[in-house]
Amino acid sequence: MEKFAPVAALLLLLLCFPVAFSGHDYGQALSKSLLFFEAQRSGVLPRNQRVTWRSHSGLTDGKSSGVNLVGGYYDAGDNVKFGLPMAFTVTMMAWSVIEYGNQLQANGELGNSIDAIKWGTDYFIKAHPEPNVLYGEVGDGNTDHYCWQRPEEMTTDRKAYRIDPSNPGSDLAGETAAAMAAASIVFRRSNPVYSRLLLTHAYQLFDFADKYRGKYDSSITVAQKYYRSVSGYNDELLWAAAWLYQASNNQFYLDYLGRNGDAMGGTGWSMTEFGWDVKYAGVQTLVAKFLMQGKAGRHAPVFRKYQEKADSFMCSLLGKSSRNIQKTPGGLIFRQRWNNMQFVTSASFLTTVYSDYLTSSRSNLRCAAGNVAPSQLLSFAKSQVDYILGDNPRATSYMVGYGNNFPQRVHHRGSSIVSVKVDRTFVTCRGGYATWFSRKGSDPNLLTGAIVGGPDAYDNFADRRDNYEQTEPATYNNAPLLGVLARLSSGHSGYSQFLPVVPAPVVRRPMPIRRPKVTTPVRASGPVAIVQKITSSWVSKGRTYYRYSTTVINKSSRPLKSLNLSIKNLYGPIWGLSRSGNSFGLPSWMHSLPSGKSLEFVYIHSTTPANVAVSSYTLA
């Protein structure tokens, strides 16, 4: 018996401590991963910018289109601002804060996480100047990729591309609505005014996406080569509805998920991926959460089908399904050669939250091979993160700056060229390729926290700057990892939401919402007529809000060259007009209103309609 004493002592020692996720410093990895977002910032950098080799950039974005589009994030190693992956990035960062805010706070990174989210949502507010207009890209991938320049001095085309009713993009508008709705939950306590503003934009964007349907890359065709919408837009409409329900507790969005789950593929597709294009697995995970929380009501049969598909996705990751996801010999899930790591981090996030959802509801995962304990999902997520951080056949960390063996030649313009703060010598478009891209040496600027594309199907990796499939990072690689790292850093301390779940809706036939009377439905001033109507209403925190659509009609036989409106008793945001002091006029993009045509603008507030009157006008 004595020879087993050391083993017994070791076991006793282990039992004295909670089983922690040892081996890697997840808190350090979390802190580094947030720095990457600061390296990707576009616009005027704040004074507390911690990535000091970066400087201001993209300061005229949107100017040629008459809109301010300064800010936001560069998506990867280039200098283009792509709206669809940027919105997904913000949605996933917000989801991380919603579920793991306590853990982020314990690591001292909650504030930095919220700042990273706001950097994105501030930009989306600018990119959504009217209810049915959304700017979805700044810059052109073709011309941008022709050059290798620092973002601070790029000479490439900065044209802005938008979607509108004539050129729709339901996937882009839907994902942006999801991002705004999720972020509104994050700011609900710390900045309630900003939270309400984000939710207002989310409502508008969802309406736009749902009413004017179409794929965004059919309207913004320059995006097709880089971020083609292969899955279409039905997944984004369901995704946006799920986030709007979580943010507003509005029964309409729960009903939308229930009514459209079958027709839009939410209950039909068993997924093997989740990312910026395909959102079904994320939708299924969220709807399963609503079901576990007892919120499904009459939609429970449909929501159970959503959950079956969520279970199927999780089981395929664990190798316990009839259709399992491919893994490398070293155990990393593998989807494709180009930037495979995006699917690793996003799947790891879903398994992490699903493990906690199941644990909270005292449920098990149902797989074809039998029931599986939720802890196995969390262990799977840990295995993927550990692989990223260095537990792999190459002993390589795929997070730049973490560990001793990480990529040194990242496919990234900003990090591969000496900082403009160190050497202000202008780097020309093609000269950047000759001088900096082709260098064999390490990057002059450390892109701390960046998750690169990662190894191939056989765990092989080539640390070369021209190997963009493996060495290029992306914001949507890092975003899902925030929540996973925060959760793993807490060990087995348990699942604890930072923000309370909204109360479950009362399952009964809702009373009709009383709408205020529009006392002056038609108001005319000479040849200009004004018609106001309520198009929607909702309740938030006990207060009813109304969306007013106001139509200005040119009844004359000549074009309306200029118009000044007086709007009194307006207590909320307004879209569709240009503003100068207390006067409102035609939007900047409209030079005149033709005879017989109309202009619509929208405002939202929680009382009777504003008093809209014509102050002056000029006919051509």
Swiss-Prot record:
Pfam families: CBM49, Glyco_hydro_9. GO terms for molecular function: carbohydrate binding; cellulase activity. Glycans are attached at residues 554, 564. Keywords: Carbohydrate metabolism, Cell wall biogenesis/degradation, Cellulose degradation, Glycoprotein, Glycosidase, Hydrolase, Polysaccharide degradation, Secreted, Signal. Its main location: secreted. It is found in: Secreted. The active site is at 78 (nucleophile), 411, 463, 472. It catalyses: Endohydrolysis of (1->4)-beta-D-glucosidic linkages in cellulose, lichenin and cereal beta-D-glucans. Residues 1-22 form the signal peptide. Its EC number is 3.2.1.4. GO terms for biological process: cell wall organization; cellulose catabolic process. InterPro entries: 6-hairpin_glycosidase_sf (IPR008928), 6hp_glycosidase-like_sf (IPR012341), CBM_49 (IPR019028), Glyco_hydro_9 (IPR001701), Glyco_hydro_9_Asp/Glu_AS (IPR033126), Glyco_hydro_9_His_AS (IPR018221). It is an enzyme of class 3 (hydrolase). GO terms for cellular component: extracellular region. It comes from the Eukaryota. Belongs to the glycosyl hydrolase 9 (cellulase E) family. This is Endoglucanase 6.
